[in-house]
Amino acid sequence: IIGVASVITMLAIGQGSKKSIQQQISEMGSNMIMIHPGADMRGGVRQDPSAMQTLKLADYEALRDETNFLSAISPNVSSSGQLIAGNNNYPASVNGVGTEYLDIRQLTVENGEMFTEADIQSSAKVCVIGKTIVDNLFPDGSDPVGKIIRFSKIPLRVVGVLKSKGYNSMGQDQDAVVLAPYTTVMKRLLAVTYLQGVFASALTEDMTDYATEEITEILRRNHKLKASDDDDFTIRTQQELSTMLNSTTDLMT
């Protein structure tokens, strides 16, 4: 997923790239909301999100159970490494997510199925992979569903293959993806108790502001922040990214 910093960095290329970046932002879905750990350091340097631990599983669960303006929500935690199947290997990140992540990112399982809530509860060693992963780990064209791939010596059984999305407007391969239950990545791959982010979709684009207000209230309460305390998390919306893009490119022209 393109980050805010990536958006702004790419803007240095100039006005010519504005259209392609705008297209990528719109590809995320106009209702998308991204929550990251750590205070908003707009204009400054943000700490590496993986080093910040202010977003916990309890935060995701509270948002999932209490919000009124979200249609889907998923934790996000990822681990980078080498995928191995037989004599084939490929560098990739395993993204730990929930079942609703497909709806948020507008992904579809084409072969097999998405992992289940039961898989999440049991931290099952299962995964869903994109076409690029299939092509590199199973170049003989065999069906990967049911096969075992290894990541950091952990065996993961492939239960589904995502429908191809190809390259996005910025040349990023959207099929080089591996999805696994977030519990599996947290417990078996990283041994952490915190999240790198939470992704959500508002019920409608018009309800995005209501959703972010609600998210802010719940997280501040969960984190026991006083009225004078700054947020120890950052919320970004697709609409906000578009606004940031427009204002930044306008300054440069």
Can you annotate each of these PLM segments?
Residues I1-A5, P144, D250-T253:
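Internal alpha-helical transmembrane segments of multipass membrane proteins
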Residues I1-K19:
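Short, strongly hydrophobic transmembrane alpha-helices
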Residues Q15-S93, V97-D103, D135-N136, M186-K187, ...:
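Hydrophobic, regular-secondary-structure patches
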Residues M34, S71-S74, G160, F199, ...:
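Residues embedded in well-ordered beta-strands within globular domains across many folds
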Residues D40-S50, R220-D232, R236:
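Short, flexible, glycine-rich and Lys/Arg-enriched loop motifs at helix boundaries
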Residues Q82, G146-R150, T234:
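Residue-level detector of beta-strand face positions
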Residues N95, T99-F115, D119, A124-S228:
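Mid-to-C-terminal secondary-structure elements
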Residues I215, K226-T253:
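Peri-transmembrane interface segments
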